[in-house]
């Protein structure tokens, strides 16, 4: 059935339900399994896995691992001591995972921190720090954000100018990575040791130590490539 929490709830074992609405505080000592939507404007803590079809978090959710097969919208806080398995997710609040994140589509308008991320489509306009690999088919990054990744693998990556952001002098590059590899790469405000691609465009604010390209390399608007190599 449906569970509503407006004050406080403590469950010593697992909680199974069709829907969960929490505007108060819920603590589940086992796992949470929800066949429908979990809606949280309060606080939910789950000792084991939190699994749901849909999720809408404006409060805080913390679990050992998070699994959402459908759509997840988080304007609050989502934390996982393990990994996250997501369908289509949008974080305008904060997302922190100590394990890897796997998603079909991931949009970061707030902040994200994870060891590694894999997605079919990845879009960011906020802040992220990915210690290891960001692997996605299509990556779009707004120039107004701040992004750090160990390595990036993709089919296409575009750093695009945000029409609503006027650069008045940056503290640091928009994107920093050790290596970036893909078919089509369009870079702005990017610092990387190695960039590998078929079609590579290095634009304003870029400092790239080495570019290895197979088809075409374009350097424009003051972008810097220290060592271009056609492979």
Task: Place the predicted regions along the sequence by residue.
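Extended beta-solenoid/beta-helix repeat architectures
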Residues: 1-231
């Amino acid at each position: 059935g449906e569970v509503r929490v407006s004050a406080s709830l403590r469950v010593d074992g697992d909680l199974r339900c069709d829907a969960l609405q929490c505007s108060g505080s819920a603590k589940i000592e086992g796992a949470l399994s929800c066949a429908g939507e979990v809606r949280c404007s309060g606080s939910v803590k789950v000792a084991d896995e939190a699994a749901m079809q849909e999720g809408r978090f404006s409060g805080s959710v913390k679990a050992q691992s998070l699994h959402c097969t459908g759509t997840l919208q988080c304007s609050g806080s989502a934390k996982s001591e393990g990994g996250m398995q997501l369908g289509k997710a949008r974080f305008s609040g904060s997302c922190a995972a100590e394990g890897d994140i796997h998603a079909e589509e991931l949009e970061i308008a707030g902040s994200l921190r994870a060891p590694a991320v894999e997605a079919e489509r990845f879009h960011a306009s906020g802040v992220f720090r990915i210690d290891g690999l960001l692997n996605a088919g299509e990556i779009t990054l707004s120039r107004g954000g701040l992004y750090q990744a160990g390595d990036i693998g993709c089919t296409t990556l575009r750093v695009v100018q945000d029409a609503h952001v006027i650069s008045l002098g940056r503290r640091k590059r928009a994107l920093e990575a050790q290596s970036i590899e893909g078919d089509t790469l369009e870079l702005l405000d990017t610092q990387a040791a190695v960039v590998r691609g078929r079609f590579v465009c290095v634009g304003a604010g870029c400092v790239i130590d080495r570019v290895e390209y197979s088809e075409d390399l374009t350097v424009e608007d003051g972008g810097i490539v220290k060592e271009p190599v056609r492979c």
